[in-house]
Every structure is written in structure tokens, then in C-alpha cells.
């Protein structure tokens, strides 16, 4: 295949995948648009007022998403046809640290182009629906900080990969895979301790009923919990979350303050005020959050992922995917027609990696993503069942219901869209599965 035909074929594939994404997203939009009345099957999960709020939020995000995605797709097409990337690559060729200069300038340009969209999403949509907690000053400081940290982390990795390509011999892709795998594990280890605190303040969860119950849950499962933190997620957004991290005998749990309610939230906020943090809560914010038993049920679900080896399985799947992707890169990275089709007159490895990962592997990435969604949904049901088996079924149902309401999750979904994109099954399906498990084990 000559260079011109190859370029057209890869661009056509890119457009086909984009249109597929637009098709299933439009199906989801129509499902939400047409669901004006609250269906009977979700009435016990969400009230009439909350249902209307969730529907309005989703429709606003859908409409914004359509315009944003079409803008990005048309911009990318114009950049590819117009030769923007080759122009920037060769225009920066005379600078020391060519790759770093190219990637940095491109990243800054992309950030500036996307800035109006991100500002609209944050300060118009999220703000209108009660989620945004950022000031404009905090927003820009946070974005600049993230960009600088991203540069500091990315550039050594890129240069390490480039050095391996040049010096690694015929099996360089194996060494790249090993190098990237080690870097990923290292970042997973150091990120929560050294990088995340650059953006948010983490405090030990105050002593009390919640801490005692979480420690008892961890001990009952022989989970090697060493630290239990709470983070002030409410300074950015009202969305709630919790996660675990760590290796071997050094496991830690982090709760967002938005997950908590009542006295537990008040104790946490007292910590933040004492540390100089500003806490502002609306009446809606005060209504959000879970009771202690529901938080414990959520962590029972998260510990289910650990006990059922889901974390390790996901890591193995990620490693297999990385190895395959780098093997494909190793096979195609000197394919001159690929570079020529996109406007390059030599074969720079960094450009080759960008082209192969974004365009040559595009269809594979789409199929792999759907496969991971299917696997993830199965794991979520398994973790829910694990928590229910511990006796937290009813509290888990309460927690899932509150998570859905607090985050304005729409309980109605298009089946195809959900099957292709929802790594976590809809709340309706999860609640039904927990109840079916409870009925089976009475």
C-alpha cells in the first residue's frame, strides 16, 4: 500500500470509530431525552425531583459532549490533512532536546485550544448543577501545576523509551515493555505519597465509629491496612469517591470527604479548617453523603476486588496489552510509508509511536476497550456479591442509591451504550443483582 492510500485508510478508520462512538452516544442521549417520566422500576431508587435533576444534568453533558467531540474530530482531521504535526516537528528540530520541545509546545497548544471547552464544562455545566467548587484562580493554578508535573514525569520516560529503541537491538520492544512496566509500578507506588499531596491535602481519618468499623472490616479479611486517609475532594467538586492503593503488606485507603455525612464529615472539616483550608457547603452539599455503615459497605465492595484478585488480574491484562502494543510498534516503526503518508520525510521513533498507537492500533484499542468494559462489569458484580456475603447487602444498596443520587447518575440507560462503555453497571442492575443474591442465600 502506498503512503497516500495508507493515510486515507487510517484516517477513514479513525472516522469510522468516531462515528460509531457518536452513534452509541446519540442512542444514550435519546434514551435520556425520551425518559421524561420516572419509570416505575426506579422509583424506589430516586425521587421525582432528583430524577429531573439527573436527567437535566445528563442532557446538558450530552449536548456539550456532541459539540466538543465534533470540534476535536474536525480539528484533528484538519491538522492531519494540513500537515500541522510534521510542521511543528521540523520547526523545532534545531532546538536542544528536540522531543521535549516538540511535545511541550504541542501540549501547550492543545491545552489552550481546549481551554474554553474545559472552562465551560467546569464553570457553566458543573456549576449550574451544584458540583463545581473551584474558583477561577484555583482552577488555573491547579491546571498549571498539573501540566508542570506531567512534563516532569513524561519527559524522562519518553527519552528512556527513545534510548532503548536506538540501543536495544532487535528485541528492543521487550525492553521497552519491561521499562514501562517498572515505571508504571513505581508511579503507582509513589503517586499517592509524593505526587497527589501536591494537589490535595490528606489527613488521617479521625478516631471514631467509622474508623473503628473500617479497621474491624480490614482485620476480618486479613487486609494489611496501614493507613486510612481522608482527602478534601470538596474543594474541587461535589462528586464522591473512595479508593485503595499499595502493595504487599502496605495497604492504604483514601476516602473523599464528600462520601461522608453528619458527625464524621464535621470532624474531617474541622481538620481542614485547622490546616487553613476553606470549607464552603451549600444546603445540597449537607444533604449528600452516606452514613457510617454505608461507607463500610462501599469499602467491603472495594476489598472484594482485592480478595477476589481483581486488581492483580487487571494488572496482568494491562501488561499483556502493553506487550502486544509494543510488539506491534516494534514491527511497524520503520514502515516508511506510514511516516510519508502523514507528511514526515524520515522515521523518528517518537512520531512512529504516536502514529502506531493512535492510528494503526485504533481498531484493536476500541475492541480491547469493550473487552475491558465487559470484564470490569463482571468484576463489579463480583465485588458487590462479596460485600453482600459479608452481611453488608442492605447497606450497599443504600450506598449505591445515594451515590447515584448524589452524583446525578441517570438510572435509565441505552443497553448498547451501557454494554460498550459502562465499566460499572448501572445502579438499577447492581441493586437487582444484590437483591437476587440475598434472596438466593436466605
From Swiss-Prot:
Subcellular location field: Endoplasmic reticulum membrane; Membrane
Alphabetical list of Pfam families matching this protein: Peptidase_M48, Peptidase_M48_N
Segments on the Lumenal face: 1-62, 106-146, 192-311, 371-442
Entry keyword Zinc: yes
Enzyme class: hydrolase
Active site positions: 302, 384 (proton donor)
Record's cofactor remark: Binds 1 zinc ion per subunit.
Gene Ontology CC terms, in alphabetical order: endoplasmic reticulum membrane; membrane
The keyword ATP-binding is annotated on this UniProt entry: no
GO MF terms, alphabetically ordered: metal ion binding; metalloendopeptidase activity
Family: Belongs to the peptidase M48A family.
Binding site for Zn(2+): 301, 305, 380
Source organism (scientific name): Caenorhabditis elegans
Lineage of origin: Eukaryota, Metazoa, Ecdysozoa, Nematoda, Chromadorea
Annotated transmembrane regions: 63-83, 85-105, 147-167, 171-191, 312-332, 350-370
Membrane-topology descriptor: Multi-pass membrane protein
Reactions catalysed according to its record: Hydrolyzes the peptide bond -P2-(S-farnesyl or geranylgeranyl)C-P1'-P2'-P3'-COOH where P1' and P2' are amino acids with aliphatic side chains and P3' is any C-terminal residue
Entry protein name: CAAX prenyl protease 1 homolog
Main localization (coarse): endoplasmic reticulum
EC number(s) on file: 3.4.24.84
Record CDD domains: M48A_Zmpste24p_like
GO BP term, example: CAAX-box protein processing
Cofactor(s), by name: Zn(2+)
Cytoplasmic side: 84, 168-170, 333-349
Function: Proteolytically removes the C-terminal three residues of farnesylated proteins.
InterPro entries listed in its UniProt record: CAXX_Prtase_1, Peptidase_M48, Peptidase_M48_N
Keywords tagged on the record: Endoplasmic reticulum, Hydrolase, Membrane, Metal-binding, Metalloprotease, Protease, Transmembrane, Transmembrane helix, Zinc
